[in-house]
Amino acid sequence: LDVWAHSVAALSHVPPEPTIRIAALLHDIGKPSCFTVDENRIGHCYGHAQIGAEIAEEILLRLKSDRATQTAVCDLIRFHDRLIEPNERSVRRALQLRGSAFFFDLMRLKRADNLAQAPEFRSRQTDYDVIEQMAHGILERADCLSLSDLAVNGDDLKGIGIPSGRTMGAVLRHLLEQVTDDHLPNEKNALLTYAASLPPDFAPPKTHE
């Protein structure tokens, strides 16, 4: 299928809700402007999701769409190609992007995108079932997904000598990542012991997710 036919097919697989239907129609609009062919004559559209989000924003601005719709549509397009694997770490990371409502809209778009491909490429639907089941379990358990869910806060960190400001913010975000990835339990003593072991000028390593 070409981009237009694929987009129309994806549109037929999403619910009749304006935000997700606009996102489905425009989700691959960035592909033509970033299409390249490699030495094996295989086509690629690297970066099309980000470019598509920027183009969609321009379109929605011209149409005088409200800001909430612009943000939701552009975020769905921006993240529609993000790999979400059927494991809890990956699902928690996806839930942290924009919250649970956005996550399930994103899954609807990803399902539609996959169903709009040729039959031999529609194999991800089973993975999506597992991913959504995991997400419901994570939400029902009230897993730690945000800084406010952490068992420690800024006052706790001050109590072990971590200064306010950039360092404290970096430590809190790092603790959240450690809990998200199951490297630490979300328990006050465990988090404070780990935080106390970090260097005074702690800065987390850069990630490329």
Located regions from the model:
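Divalent metal-dependent catalytic cores for phosphoryl transfer on phosphate-bearing substrates
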Residues: 2-125
